[in-house]
């Protein structure tokens, strides 16, 4: 999974230039045709987001806008819901299984949100649930009891037509953080700390290894102006990942 951080233009709710949209579309299309792109989404600014913080059995819910604080995903769930409140309800149940921690809900950008096509009647609301990393996930995963409870909840969400798909990530010790400054690249091998920048979007890719991922990120950075931060993480494909 390649994850890029939020930028000031997205945070301000400004539409990207059409030239950038076309260039990015060509870039993604090329790799999709080659069978490399499995999934991906961009997220709207923080005003459309909700942060849930769980402490000592209590949950604090904060709607955006807000700044990034503990931005290090351990997993994601793509939800299709009728309202933001419905997504918050599912996120509360998910978070209570895990105990102390933090979850973020972010609205997924649709084609009509970025001016590519007109919005349909009663458009779907897709929200990305971001399960933030903690000591347990960085050490190798949740407990067997937590995994079983999450699996049951995901089954319920799927039956309700809410859960579109989900994935979990391996610890940052197996990832890399790429920082581009004017197209100059600095690579930080994991483990690495949480970022203070909100997640702006992600792509799930099937690649030969980090060398190919870094090459793709170079082109991606050039399209976006040459200055940005990208985390490259390995998707956990073990059978007991939950």
Go through each PLM region and give its residues:
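Conserved, structured core segments of small domains
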Residues: 1-242
């Amino acid at each position: 999974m390649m994850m890029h951080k939020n930028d000031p233009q997205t945070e301000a709710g400004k539409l990207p230039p059409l030239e950038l949209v076309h260039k990015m579309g060509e870039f993604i299309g090329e790799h999709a045709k080659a069978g490399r792109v499995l999934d991906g989404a961009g997220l709207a600014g923080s005003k459309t987001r909700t942060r849930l913080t769980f402490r000592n059995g209590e949950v604090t819910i904060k709607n955006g806008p807000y700044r990034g604080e503990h931005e290090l995903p351990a997993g994601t769930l793509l939800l299709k819901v009728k309202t933001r409140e419905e997504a918050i309800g599912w996120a509360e149940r998910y978070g209570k299984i895990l105990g102390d921690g933090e979850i973020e809900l972010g609205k997924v950008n649709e084609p009509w949100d970025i001016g590519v096509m007109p919005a349909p009647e009663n458009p779907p609301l897709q929200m990305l649930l971001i399960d933030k990393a903690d000591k347990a996930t960085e050490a190798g995963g949740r407990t067997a009891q937590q995994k079983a409870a999450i699996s049951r909840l995901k089954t319920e969400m799927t039956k309700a037509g809410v859960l579109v798909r989900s994935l979990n990530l391996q610890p940052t010790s197996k990832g890399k953080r790429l920082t581009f400054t004017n197209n100059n690249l600095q690579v930080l091998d994991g483990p690495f700390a949480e970022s203070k920048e909100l997640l702006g979007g992600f792509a799930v890719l099937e690649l030969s290894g980090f060398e190919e991922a870094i090459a793709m990120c170079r082109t991606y950075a050039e399209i976006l102006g040459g200055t940005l931060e990208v985390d490259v993480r390995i998707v956990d494909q073990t059978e007991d990942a939950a």
